[in-house]
A protein has these predicted regions:
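Structured C-terminal helix/loop/strand segments within mature extracytoplasmic catalytic/sensor domains
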Residues: 135-186
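Short, surface-exposed loop or secondary-structure junction motifs
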Residues: 1-130
């Protein structure tokens, strides 16, 4: 076989000096990690482990879930994405990134390969450009990168604490993203 996704990501993260951004964080991170949900399936409060049940079944490592980080480390990743958009191959070759951010051909879909694209209903609000890409997490996280405006927004919350039955994030995300973009742009 090949290289596991967590090992491949750790190699990239080290090369880019992303710091605290990784799958399956060490137990030493738990005191500074926000808890998520009192999970009835696992019978305990989750903290420092993947929340997504499918991701947990896959050992805490999956392409759609399980990455832990700080605002600073996610911001460093966003900076690497912006540099790749500008032609400097930081996280991938620019042509590879272009493929990953290409909107799917499904009518009305905002999805790309691992990314969401801007729509009027997007979680990123209305201030980012049409070239913005983003990814949201069920637990209340999001990252939106706008190459046209050369900015990014990182939002890390624990909206599922103490339970997943909290939909306030759906209104909060667009508001926060819009407020940040308005504060950063002339």
């Amino acid at each position: 076989g090949g290289v596991r996704i967590d090992q491949q990501f750790a190699s990239i993260a080290d090369e880019l000096t992303l710091g605290d951004l990784r799958f399956r964080p060490p137990c030493a991170w738990r005191p500074r990690t926000a808890p998520t949900e009192v999970d009835p399936w696992r019978g305990r409060l989750l903290c420092g482990e993947v929340h997504d049940e499918n991701g947990w079944a896959l050992g805490g490592v999956a392409g759609h879930t399980g990455l832990f980080g700080t605002v600073k480390s996610v911001g460093r990743f966003a900076q690497a994405v912006l540099k790749t958009f500008s032609g400097e191959p930081k996280i991938a070759q620019p042509a590879t990134l272009a493929r990953f951010v290409e909107r799917s051909s499904v009518p009305g879909s905002s999805r790309a390969l691992g990314w969401d694209r801007m729509l009027v209903t997007s979680s990123c609000g209305h201030q980012l450009s049409g070239s913005a890409i983003g990814h949201t997490g069920f637990t209340g996280t999001s990252l939106w990168v706008d190459p046209q405006q050369n900015l990014y927004v990182v939002l890390l919350t624990n909206r599922v604490h103490p339970t997943r039955h909290n939909e306030a994030i759906l209104q909060l995300r667009p508001y926060v993203h819009d407020a940040i973009v308005q504060a950063l742009t002339p």
